[in-house]
Amino acid sequence: MLDFLAENNLCGQAILRIVSCGNAIIAELLRLSEFIPAVFRLKDRADQQKYGDIIFDFSYFKGPELWESKLDAKPELQDLDEEFRENNIEIVTRFYLAFQSVHKYIVDLNRYLDDLNEGVYIQQTLETVLLNEDGKQLLCEALYLYGVMLLVIDQKIEGEVRERMLVSYYRYSAARSSADSNMDDICKLLRSTGYSSQPGAKRPSNYPESYFQRVPINESFISMVIGRLRSDDIYNQVSAYPLPEHRSTALANQAAMLYVILYFEPSILHTHQAKMREIVDKYFPDNWVISIYMGITVNLVDAWEPYKAAKTALNNTLDLSNVREQASRYATVSERVHAQVQQFLKEGYLREEMVLDNIPKLLNCLRDCNVAIRWLMLHTADSACDPNNKRLRQIKDQILTDSRYNPRILFQLLLDTAQFEFILKEMFKQMLSEKQTKWEHYKKEGSERMTELADVFSGVKPLTRVEKNENLQAWFREISKQILSLNYDDSTAAGRKTVQLIQALEEVQEFHQLESNLQVCQFLADTRKFLHQMIRTINIKEEVLITMQIVGDLSFAWQLIDSFTSIMQESIRVNPSMVTKLRATFLKLASALDLPLLRINQANSPDLLSVSQYYSGELVSYVRKVLQIIPESMFTSLLKIIKLQTHDIIEVPTRLDKDKLRDYAQLGPRYEVAKLTHAISIFTEGILMMKTTLVGIIKVDPKQLLEDGIRKELVKRVAFALHRGLIFNPRAKPSELMPKLKELGATMDGFHRSFEYIQDYVNIYGLKIWQEEVSRIINYNVEQECNNFLRTKIQDWQSMYQSTHIPIPKFTPVDESVTFIGRLCREILRITDPKMTCHIDQLNTWYDMKTHQEVTSSRLFSEIQTTLGTFGLNGLDRLLCFMIVKELQNFLSMFQKIILRDRTVQDTLKTLMNAVSPLKSIVANSNKIYFSAIAKTQKIWTAYLEAIMKVGQMQILRQQIANELNYSCRFDSKHLAAALENLNKALLADIEAHYQDPSLPYPKEDNTLLYEITAYLEAAGIHNPLNKIYITTKRLPYFPIVNFLFLIAQLPKLQYNKNLGMVCRKPTDPVDWPPLVLGLLTLLKQFHSRYTEQFLALIGQFICSTVEQCTSQKIPEIPADVVGALLFLEDYVRYTKLPRRVAEAHVPNFIFDEFRTVL
């Protein structure tokens, strides 16, 4: 009959593909369960209030039109719904595809069973497949994996969350319109079961059997699979466990399968007493906590509580005397085997001869160790015992007492067993690889000894007192030939013949009285020794390695091992060289990967890489978690060193009086520093002893592990320092900003110095790591803060700054800001608020409008540079950009609402437009016309002024940041600054040349050069924030005249001061001139330049008309508003760096030249 798993066996390949797919689906479900967007849980009140109206469970399907009409009625809900869709559609689709694949899996399995019944596969029926060893295994696994999938989904992804995700996918995707979509079936299968994985939650009735029956499966198939599992040893595991007391461990995998599959036929659990007795007697006579898949544990006492037959059958196992007997037995066994293992692990004990002579003894010891570890770990696990269940608690307490359970001793046994196993495996692999070479070597040596003896008895080679003996000579030559004729490939015959040859050599020594000659005896003894070695060597079989692999399975502890983490870390802290022993434990744990990967590998599935990457990644993350204690301990020592260096140790001057030498020696503190530094070196040594290890398919380099660990600890501490250091009290007078920045600067400097100090002792690039990680922390926090302003947010798993191995911690927000960078930015905006302060441009300083005290100055930005570095300033700049964009967008919507929808305002603007046309003319009776228009539009200017001033304020801050960045760049990196400036000029020259002659080259749209250079230029402060286009705009009617009216409406609130320029007239009606000018300038910059032209023309016309009206008076005096308008034009020209003729096109130059002299 054709091999069932052969590539040309369609029947075997079809079921193998299904099972392979099942293992891949479970890995995907486990992977996705870590990425459930928190919003779908609707746990906190804020989420419920915000998203409660757009996230629905299956009640949505009762009347989708009703829900959608509610959404359509509120534009703000529609907007939120669209934003939610954009942010979550990718992850929701991924979840939906996983759910769909679960449904497809069971549909495929049902179709395969139908095909078997209908005879699609020639000569194959369900019965014949179950008779085949591989077929039987695969059919049992196929049903079992489906059950595991359902249990994993319910455990890891709550029912309500599943429903909300499915409804969201239905609403946001094209699934509803797709005719071939099986959305309905998926929803029926995965609707909420009412199960909750929270401790103490009540189990729903008929759970999980009703859940398992949502998709009908062929009943005869289920009962045949249960029959096979009850009667057969389907994986032939018993041969690896010959002792009867190990029987339940040998059948543990099969027991887990049977446990899951019984839920497909719950009548057995409920009423079939005899069957349940048989199952319990065979699989659970001495155990009741089982691992069902990759460490997911189940306690049968709890799981079988609702089923009468199952519960009754289990009572024998749970009898107090049996529990006591098992616990005492495993306590005794673990003590005995631990002593044995420690003996085996003594240096020089496990030699090749000893191992080869004692294979059964060593394997028995390994079996006992692993069985004891398994039983004790499972039955004492917290996860398997619900603290609210009195009976479970009693059983567990009984076990802890009778087994004299000590987690440290159990962990030590696990460590030693893993180390013993590892050494044995390595020795066996080495012996197997050298097996043939050694055997041939021994054969050659033995044969040569016989030839030499033959020569001795021929009389040719004289040997003291050995007479010539032709018979012996011929006999020894024959023996030599016989030894040479032994064939390695026919090991059985060779072994038998070798034993005969050894007997013959013993007999010849006796019959021919050869004992009298010591040299002949020595030759014979050597040959016998070589023949013995040949027998030993030929007996080195791969079966031993296979048995060790089966016996050493640690997949049941995939999750339980986490409960030993604190013990592992404490052991490492006390003795860093412990890491070498842990390496063997991690490798033992890695063998758990064989379980899900075996079928995927057999099926040559492309999923092999992603599944093995997932499980290997999980294990490597665990290794990192355990070893993180080393960087943590290093940093603890490091902080002590820094404290000693900064507070206790006095710096030695370059010249020193001899008698003061003792004062500066400070032997105590220096010894303390040396001791702590030595401790850091010991920790480094500990982790580097681990050697490069392949964990699953991921290569773990201890040096990289150490560096990542140091980075992780640094990130954790720096992020916390930044979070804690930048929390402000908005009511504090004066502001806490500068003192807090100085304090944080000192903390950051301490970290920086400590890193410089440590780098040589742990062999890392301290400065490089410091800069990379601090920049990552700041950039990530800026990204999170900017998410507030983005419709499509950057999720953690999409962020280029966030990392799984070296995560940046997130802290609960303490105010409206999400992160410390937002708090810093808002505090700066608060203290430089144009309503409270007055900015003096020449001094780069802000003063309080009422008290005239200095509030802050450009020193603030050099302090931020010192504390947060270039990244901090650059991040602040980026955040301000987002805020300006938001402010400008708000402004535009306000413009639409207040101006373009107000009839009165429009009529006023129309009248004014007619009065001032053409713009080059002088307006007659100008005062009346202008002030009448201002009076009619008075109500709109308050909101207008606030928006303009906010934008202006942020632009001033951006200018200050650019100045600071540019100054420090020229100072610290003059070559970079020069290179960037030259490249920028060259690019601009090329672009200008292209516009004059389009045949010349120009960067295409797909060329990223301009984007990349912009990022560099902004980081180096080589840019002008006033020239930036923040938003795209459409044409707006009345825009220039509205801005003109706005400006002249503000002029009466200001007055000219010869020393300071334009200042606020009354603090009660606050207006600050620089933010006003820069805000207007920025706003106009967003629109077509013709709007600016019209705006400037209107100001020019206002100046000329007002001056014309003044000159008709007896004593002509230049009005204050005209002075303000002229100063605006002057500042406009200065800020935009345009030639003065731009202003002179609208105002005669003599007015510009002379107006200051008149004042």
Swiss-Prot record:
**Superkingdom of origin:** Eukaryota
Q: Which disease is it linked to?
A: Spastic paraplegia 8, autosomal dominant: A form of spastic paraplegia, a neurodegenerative disorder characterized by a slow, gradual, progressive weakness and spasticity of the lower limbs. Rate of progression and the severity of symptoms are quite variable. Initial symptoms may include difficulty with balance, weakness and stiffness in the legs, muscle spasms, and dragging the toes when walking. In some forms of the disorder, bladder symptoms (such as incontinence) may appear, or the weakness and stiffness may spread to other parts of the body. Ritscher-Schinzel syndrome 1: A developmental malformation syndrome characterized by craniofacial abnormalities, congenital heart defects, and cerebellar brain malformations. Facial features include prominent occiput, prominent forehead, low-set ears, downslanting palpebral fissures, depressed nasal bridge, and micrognathia. Cardiac defects can include septal defects and aortic stenosis, among others, and brain imaging shows Dandy-Walker malformation, cerebellar vermis hypoplasia, posterior fossa cysts, and ventricular dilatation. Affected individuals have severe developmental delay.
Q: Which GO terms describe its biological process?
A: actin filament polymerization; endosomal transport; endosome fission; endosome organization; lysosome organization; meiotic spindle assembly; oocyte maturation; polar body extrusion after meiotic divisions
Which Pfam families does the record associate with it?
Strumpellin (PF10266)
The Phosphoserine modification is found at 917
Its quaternary organisation is:
Component of the WASH core complex also described as WASH regulatory complex (SHRC) composed of WASH (WASHC1, WASH2P or WASH3P), WASHC2 (WASHC2A or WASHC2C), WASHC3, WASHC4 and WASHC5. The WASH core complex associates via WASHC2 with the F-actin-capping protein dimer (formed by CAPZA1, CAPZA2 or CAPZA3 and CAPZB) in a transient or substoichiometric manner which was initially described as WASH complex. Interacts with VCP, PI4K2A.
Q: Does the record carry Cytoplasm as a key word?
A: yes
Give me the disulphide-bonded residues: none
Q: What does this protein do?
A: Acts as a component of the WASH core complex that functions as a nucleation-promoting factor (NPF) at the surface of endosomes, where it recruits and activates the Arp2/3 complex to induce actin polymerization, playing a key role in the fission of tubules that serve as transport intermediates during endosome sorting. May be involved in axonal outgrowth. Involved in cellular localization of ADRB2. Involved in cellular trafficking of BLOC-1 complex cargos such as ATP7A and VAMP7.
| Origin organism lineage | Eukaryota, Metazoa, Chordata, Craniata, Vertebrata
Which terms in the GO cellular component ontology are assigned? Answer: cytosol; early endosome; early endosome membrane; endoplasmic reticulum; endosome; neuronal cell body; WASH complex
Subcellular location(s): the record lists: Cytoplasm, Cytosol; Endoplasmic reticulum; Early endosome
Entry keywords, A to Z:
Cytoplasm, Disease variant, Endoplasmic reticulum, Endosome, Hereditary spastic paraplegia, Intellectual disability, Neurodegeneration, Phosphoprotein, Protein transport, Transport
What's this protein's family per the entry? Belongs to the strumpellin family.
Q: In which tissues is it expressed?
A: Expressed ubiquitously.
Membrane-crossing segments per the record? none
InterPro entries of this UniProt entry? Answer: WASH_strumpellin
What is this protein's record name? WASH complex subunit 5
